[in-house]
Amino acid sequence: VRSRRQRQMWIRDSNNYIRQQIEKGFAAYIYDFKYPDLSIIAYNQLLKNKDKYAKPVGFYVINFDDPRYSHRCNPLNPSFLSDIADAYESAYVIMLNLNKSWIQKQGDFFVESPIVLFAAVIWYLKIYENGKFCTFPHAIELLNKPYSDLFTILTSYRELENYLSPFMDAWKGGAMEQLQGQIASAKIPLSRLISPALYWIMTGDDFTLDINNPEEPKVLCVGNNPDRQNIYSCALGLYNARIVKMVNRKGRLKCSILVDEVPTLYFKGLDTLIATARSNKVAVCLGAQDFSQLIRDYGDKEARVIQNTIGTVSY
């Protein structure tokens, strides 16, 4: 009974949180784990309060279950990738959302290898023909090409030649089992994301992710599905990482970040966002059934930092 009451209290709090923030003219990012529960509230509240925004406000949805009711957005837009480190960060978020056990094994050889390989693929798509094909689906498809063709293409670019030297050394040295293991560590998890709906949504540009742009404020709802969370959380984690970097800047509109059931995805940079974004008018609200879930999925150190940095905790 107690846990049920706690859950009901959380639902009421999150609903009221959304209502109050939109009433006050906040831009908003809402991670809706059981879509469309929170998204409906946000949409209806926005209809009543459009006059609270100085500029016309847009409402956008990412919905992998039914693309007919989804906007399209490319989280690997070339404009987001200024350096190969940005490609690495994207690959890092993707891989750790696909393999949450890796969160506590960061730095291990068989964790870093697939991240580095996928980062190289992303960066190649960024520099090839000015990023014409720089999307997450294109990266998955390129990675699944025969590795002899893949490495020949990637290492034809000088800036990727040194980046991939461990793979090339294994290839030229005849360590084929090691090489195939490294490649499979990237290919196998990503193969779960091969989906026409996901591909279509993640290759378009209906809107930009600067949700708190004073000239183009947005309320963005991204929907997960409890039955497919292991698939969708990976893609949604990439949107999260992009938004975190873009909203935490000075001179932006006040903004709300609401993450329902935060343990269900790896939200890179969440601890830093909580600690530093207040001065940039970013309000963060997290929901979880129990703190032990956060420890399980984020690791004890990162979970403790998040818990200790949060200003208010409601049970």
Regions found by a protein language model. Give the residues of each.
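P-loop NTPase motor domains
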Residues: 5-282, 298
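Conserved ATP-driven motor cores of ASCE-family P-loop NTPases powering translocation/secretion/packaging/pilus
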Residues: 274-276, 280-315
